[in-house]
Design a protein with these regions (language model features):
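Short flexible/disordered coil segments
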Residues: 164-175, 198-203, 222-233, 267-282, ...
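Long, compositionally biased intrinsically disordered regions
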Residues: 2-9, 38, 300-422
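Short secondary-structure transition/capping segments
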Residues: 149-156, 178-190, 210-216, 286-293, ...
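Gly/Ser/Thr-rich active-site loops/lids in small-molecule metabolic enzymes
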Residues: 230-235, 292-303
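A broadly tuned preference for mixed-charge, low-complexity surface segments
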Residues: 156-165, 189-193, 255-271, 320-337
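Extended, hydrophobic interaction surfaces within ordered domains
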Residues: 35-53, 269-271, 275-288, 301, ...
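Mid-to-C-terminal catalytic subdomains of enzymes
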Residues: 246, 251-297
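ATP-dependent adenylation/nucleotidyltransferase module used to activate substrates
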Residues: 2-256, 383, 387, 391, ...
Length: 422
């Protein structure tokens, strides 16, 4: 995951990044605190427990920090001086391609799809292309608050908004058959994206916009670095207008618009569904209800009986620690380590960390006075990334073209297209 800046007094004083149930907080002098969460409100600093990057439970089960936290390069600087100069550059690059076309943005309400939508709304005024935001609401798992925010953004930008949703009967069927989406198998993603692609095809759109950025995740870095080197904003029918933006570019733009998502103000790193398996434990107490909690409870009880109970995990542990986010094997390891860390905290042997203190770190970049960091050219940024790749080759290329490990999954989601219009 991409490290976010910790801002205090108009200065960047460090970074914070979370992955799975770890959070890593670093200062600018190399100081580092690795936090492991054992509940939605409590965690502990576990650096002294680390053995070769792992935290072990007494029974030998362990969780590996590097396996669960992909720490991407920290970019506490801007990649362009101001929005007008970037717009001028973008129009020069894509003007001939976009003029008179239909462009669709898959809009989630998050910061990255917001800035992509904003810069294209400005470009559309100059180039005369049709811009449409398409928001796919996830039934049962996503709060209605996000829908309201998406509508607010579209109104502010003066852009047409189309709302779509996967069929509720199919989504409900998947929930009971497959359990809630979990890490490594988010069947929800296909069901969410399919209505957007169908709309794109229905209206004969020319380009589909992604707000993905280069250093958000390792997977996206591998996919986008070649395009960054080539300066390639358009690839086939895909348009990536902001994929080289840094986190500082994004925050500056979002705050200038006054369109900060409520989740960011609650201290959440990402805008996602209330039941997203990629949330960290500390995020759940600041997450909005969906109104379908009784239904989800039934789903959770079923999958607990089928796949997790035999792993020695209690129902309370499964529910309170949101262990459905993991495969049963991974959940067993996490639960053992969490129990061990919690006991050490109760004995006073580890420093306890409250979830509210980490949420406050994430919130700072949305409310504190913003710093005025340096501006780096794309060539300078690419050179930094080249050095990072050279220093982290094993990590960057680990798992590339590796065989599937689906045997560790609790099951494999099956997308049955013929039932889509059910």
């Amino acid at each position: 995951m991409e490290p976010y800046p910790i801002i205090r007094g108009g200065k960047v004083v460090g970074s914070v990044v979370s992955g799975s149930d770890f959070t890593i907080v670093e200062d600018l002098h190399g100081g580092r605190r690795t936090i492991l969460w054992f509940s939605s409100e409590r965690g502990a600093v576990v650096d002294r427990l680390l053995v070769d990057g792992r935290v072990y439970a007494p029974n030998g089960l362990y969780v590996d920090v590097e396996q669960w936290v992909e720490v991407m390069p920290f970019q506490p600087y801007h990649s362009f001086s101001d929005i007008d100069s970037y717009l001028q550059w973008l129009v020069g690059v894509v003007g001939d391609v976009l003029r008179g076309k239909k462009v669709v943005v898959g809009f989630s309400g998050g910061k990255d799809s917001l800035v992509a939508s904003y810069i294209l709304s400005l470009a559309s005024e100059k180039l005369g292309f049709k811009l449409i935001l398409v928001y796919s609401h996830v039934p049962f798992l996503e709060s209605e608050e996000n829908r309201g925010f998406v509508e607010k953004v579209a109104n502010r930008l003066g852009v047409e908004l189309v709302e779509v949703e996967p069929p509720k009967p199919i989504f409900r069927e998947y929930m009971f058959r497959e359990g809630l989406p979990y890490r490594g198998t988010r069947w929800c993603t296909y069901l969410k994206v399919r209505p957007i692609r169908e709309f794109f095809k229905k209206i004969g759109a020319d380009y589909l916009v992604s707000g993905d950025r280069l250093v958000e995740t390792l997977k996206r870095f591998r996919r986008l670095i070649g395009a960054a080197v080539k300066g390639q904003i358009v690839a086939g029918k895909h348009l990536r207008p902001t994929f080289t933006w840094t986190i500082m570019d994004v925050v500056r733009c979002v705050r200038s618009l006054g369109l900060v998502h409520p989740d960011y103000l609650r201290g959440l790193p990402r805008v996602s569904c209330s039941w997203c398996p990629y949330k960290c434990l500390f995020e759940f107490t600041a997450t909005q209800a969906t109104g379908w909690e009784d239904l989800i409870e039934k789903v959770l009880r079923r999958e607990y009986r089928l796949w997790y109970q035999q792993r020695g995990i209690s129902w309370d542990e499964f529910r309170e620690r949101r262990l459905w986010r993991y495969t049963p094997k991974a959940a067993q390891a996490w639960n053992a380590v969490m129990n061990y860390v919690e006991k050490l905290v109760e004995k006073g042997e580890l420093e306890e960390v409250k979830a509210s203190s980490v949420r406050e770190l994430y919130k700072r970049m949305w409310v504190e006075e913003l710093p005025n960091p340096p501006v780096k050219t794309l060539d300078e940024i690419l050179e930094e990334l080249r050095k990072w790749v050279e220093a982290n080759r094993d990590k960057v290329f680990a798992g590339v073209n590796a065989p599937s490990t689906s045997s560790t999954h609790r099951h494999r989601a099956r997308i049955r297209a013929e039932k889509w219009n059910h």
